[in-house]
């Protein structure tokens, strides 16, 4: 068979290609095609486009048309007989058979320039490299970007002015795709994106697990096989693209109500953070609350005050504040009902003076024409006043004010003098009575060991009892010398705000002033004279373990101690928001597309922070013994803080004491004193499950009896796997719930496993609500988590 030359730009048949290869190998060196000769890439034959007819120019050859379109910055040169068009878009579904482009070009009859109802497309990129051509973004979402590029075929690479194909020296093997973050709004730690390898025949690839509203630089490298050097890079292309803006996260702190009149409410707005895009606007929402029935407002019906009156709904948008400048996002005060216009809404004065009002917020994030809004509903906590909300009486200038101040000073001075006299008299009588009856007034009784569960942070089982009150105070003094001493006048106590009660005494709130800076704090109030021998030993044990701990970012800070002759204060950092409450309040009702306002990344970050804190306690040989979601707190910047001293705080304003039996390991439920780091791992997994279950109650289908709970655990009952929690994460929890303590994972293992899952959070769990499906959130039953009351 004779090897004839091929005319035109159509693909060469297989047998002709083989003949051409043999001829090229037999040519002398001087007859080889020069490498610097210009070449162009023939894309294919496509359906004629009518929108290009009014922009045509005259061109006799593809090379002339390519040069014109390249000069104008277009991606493609389109030929139809002697007419030349330029285009940037190519529709793959409009590709036709190569044989339909049969009209020969005027200046070179060996080439074809379109046909009847079809056009010939050429790439304007003059190259012989098989890199990806016309790299573009074909689709994007919050967490993904879809890349597309033109398919490369070596048989379509033609010499300028000729019709023969340029045979490549390299064979395209695959593509390597990598994305790098250039700009993001997120303050969360960024994890490096993996490199993906796709086959050379692919022309599209979807990058997933990306962060919303983040600018990425995406590079696609072509890897070729060479007979001499093996695999090497033979071309590349890159593009910058931004993912869609996501639903604002995290949930902002609710506004604090400073004061109220009949027509206005003054609130304080804290700085707001958004990890899923820019913070464009802030909506201030007024909601009239019915205490008998409190339901979330419907975002579809949310509008202006006039629209609320027409629809008959008890909520409306009072203001739309601009937050697109850095100076806007700060602590600021705002008056609801001042009658002014903010953005698209008028801030109407309140028309129900006696009604209970909640102020909610709406976070609006807009990027590249896409807008997402997240609503944070106000609660009763925004009405709680703090120690900063005191108002002081003032007097008018004049003689009346001088007289009033003088009378006040005399009265209070007399009361102070009488108090001092009574104090020294009672102290004299008490000391004299002790000397008469002896130093040790404890009744001598035979006591047997009693095992009971302690509601404090650590349980003491074998500590020796102090021999006398003097010995106890001596040991206490030695421990206290290692702590920072805070003078009593640096403390401001809120004695009516009792947030917990345990064996050692009550826990109240207050403020501590150090270095001219006042901070909120919680104070464990101890009356040392009221402690018996066993409680004294337990207190010494806890203080010894507290002295072993240094400052750790995920433990509540210990500020120091303050002592007086009658009272002893242990001062800790104050955090009001418990993890349990934060998880439950984050739940969203239908028709919201999400089950929660929290992101998957944040929930995994919380589990990692908690595991890191427990690993630190384990390294210090400290056993927590009462780890649960009620002993973990969430800060204003969405970091976790673990309480390591004292009783659990009350669950609600009714002062219900939490019962953490549902978080205990089976050996602790059975013996009540077999606490260890391995039993803490069991509790850690229960709290991690709560994070995934958005505050669900562990073993919600079991009663509160310890014996029945123990029997259920022995029967292989574990907290159920929610439908949106995937196998890898749930298996990590199951490894912590082994009956044999030695077979459980360590806190370090849990932290390492969660860290790996954080590289792809949505492969571990997904809070997206399934369309048409039922809510699968585990139930939250607070009555099962509280200590049962008698009667």
Curated annotation (Swiss-Prot):
Protein name per the record: Putative inactive tyrosine-protein kinase Wsck
Annotated Protein kinase domain residues: 493-758
GO terms under biological process: anatomical structure morphogenesis; neurogenesis
Function: Probably lacks tyrosine-protein kinase activity.
Topology, Extracellular side: 27-401
Main location: membrane
SUPFAM superfamilies, sorted: Fibronectin type III, Protein kinase-like (PK-like)
Family as reported in the entry's similarity comment: Belongs to the protein kinase superfamily. Tyr protein kinase family.
Signal peptide: 1-26
UniProt cross-references to PROSITE patterns, sorted A to Z: FN3, PROTEIN_KINASE_DOM, WSC
UniProt topology in membrane: Single-pass type I membrane protein
Membrane side Cytoplasmic: residue ranges: 423-791
Coiled-coil blocks: none
Fibronectin type-III domain residues: 131-246
GO CC entries: plasma membrane
Sites carrying sugar chains: 139, 217, 329
PANTHER family xrefs: FIBROBLAST GROWTH FACTOR RECEPTOR HOMOLOG 1-RELATED, TYROSINE-PROTEIN KINASE RECEPTOR
Any GO MF annotation of the entry: ATP binding
Binding site for ATP: 499-507
Keyword set, alphabetical order: ATP-binding, Glycoprotein, Membrane, Nucleotide-binding, Receptor, Signal, Transmembrane, Transmembrane helix
Location within or outside the cell: Membrane
Domain of life: Eukaryota
Domain WSC: 39-125
Transmembrane regions listed in the UniProt entry: 402-422
Gene it is expressed from: Wsck
Gene3D superfamilies: Immunoglobulins, Phosphorylase Kinase, domain 1, Transferase(Phosphotransferase) domain 1
